[in-house]
Amino acid sequence: RGLGDVYKRQIQEPEWFFSFRSHPFNPEAGSVGSPEVESMREMMTEQDLSGFPRKGFTRNYTWRYHKDLGYGDHLERYGEVKDIETYCKYAQVVNYDQYRSFMEGWASHMWDWYTGILIWKTQNPWTSLRGQMYDWSLDVNASLYGTRKGCEPLHAYYNPVTRKAGLLNTTLKDYTDLSIVARIYNLEGKLLWEKETRASAKANTVQELLDIPVPEGIKGAYFLRLALNADVPNIYWLTTEPKDYT
């Protein structure tokens, strides 16, 4: 239930998935999943939509009826949530980061803390606002893409607790001579730091390979780009300010 029976059903900090030890095999785990604004408008009137939660507090009966889970202050970290369009846009950013962190955090402890996990649930049989990757209208939200990225069979990832880049191999095949390139950019796209390492990966293993520095001369948000064998990169938005990405 939620992300596991040992804690409340609620959104978690990305770091939490790497540091909190839950059930070794969890067949029922999930998190937030608010859809995009088009689906929201199919559920509620504009008056009800204008009562969107602020800093995680549901202020409207209709939102409670549709089982709004709440995002805490995670949306406000990206700026002022001034209307329902902004609410849904920021929610997609958080949905992606939440589920990617979820998958990467658990996989980073595979065969040590965990043996497996199942997402519950991918969809709802009604117009609900929680625990879904596609909604009643069959519209996909960003939770699906975060899960898909975090579940890549051979995957470069970032651990926000150790501040290291690592390599996950959840396949049954050994790999050799792999290239991982880490790059840090500012918000204008200027390259601030770059490092490459080469590694091998045994089947069903995880390893941490690179220390990721905090870039000098940056205050606020910046990007970390991890590319494995020049494939589709894994991009993180990080910050020097506590939970402020504005």
Over which residues does each language-model region extend?
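Glycine-rich, charged/polar anion/phosphate-binding loops
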Residues: R9-E13, L210-I212
